[in-house]
Curated annotation (Swiss-Prot):
Gene3D superfamilies hit by this protein: 3.30.230.10
GO biological process: tRNA 5'-leader removal
Subunit structure as annotated in this protein's UniProt entry: Consists of a catalytic RNA component (M1 or rnpB) and a protein subunit.
Protein name listed in UniProt: Ribonuclease P protein component
GO CC, one annotated term: ribonuclease P complex
Domain of life: Bacteria
Enzyme Commission number(s) of this protein: 3.1.26.5
Functional description taken from the UniProt entry: RNaseP catalyzes the removal of the 5'-leader sequence from pre-tRNA to produce the mature 5'-terminus. It can also cleave other RNA substrates such as 4.5S RNA. The protein component plays an auxiliary but essential role in vivo by binding to the 5'-leader sequence and broadening the substrate specificity of the ribozyme.
Family stated for the protein in its record: Belongs to the RnpA family.
A GO molecular function held by the record: ribonuclease P activity
UniProt catalytic activity: Endonucleolytic cleavage of RNA, removing 5'-extranucleotides from tRNA precursor
Pfam families hit by this protein: Ribonuclease_P
Length: 120
């Protein structure tokens, strides 16, 4: 589970990551990464709009993404990072495994993890 100290909650932090950060897209997700000068743990936030689906689908998608992101925290820089994972409509029908592949692909494209084979 993503601990409270690693959750991105404030609008200003989302804005920094979305407007000023690097962006990498996949079929189901867009990842935004920004580094701030503040000494706080890397934090992760999620944007899952109504375009993804109804309330149940949106919350299920966000829970899946939160679980995937929690497992990837150790690969990210420890301090000062803001990662926003924005779900596209196709994320609503994706499995947890498919979302994990997309998160990994996005992190590779952002240069946050080592490049692997099959990155398209």
């Amino acid at each position: 589970m993503l601990s409270a100290e690693h959750r991105l909650r404030h609008k200003d932090d989302f804005t920094v990551a979305l407007k000023n950060g690097a962006r990498a897209g996949t079929r189901r997700l867009v990842l935004h990464w920004a580094v701030t000068d503040r000494a706080h743990p890397t934090r992760v936030g999620f944007v899952v709009s109504k375009a993804v689906g109804g309330s149940v689908v949106r919350h299920r998608t966000q829970r899946r993404l939160r679980h995937v992101a929690a497992g990837r925290l150790t690969t990210l820089p420890a301090l000062g990072g803001l990662l926003v994972v924005r779900a596209l409509p196709a994320a609503g029908t994706a499995t947890s495994a498919e979302l994990a592949v997309d998160v990994d692909r996005g992190l590779r494209r952002l240069g946050l993890v080592a490049t692997g084979a099959g990155d398209g």
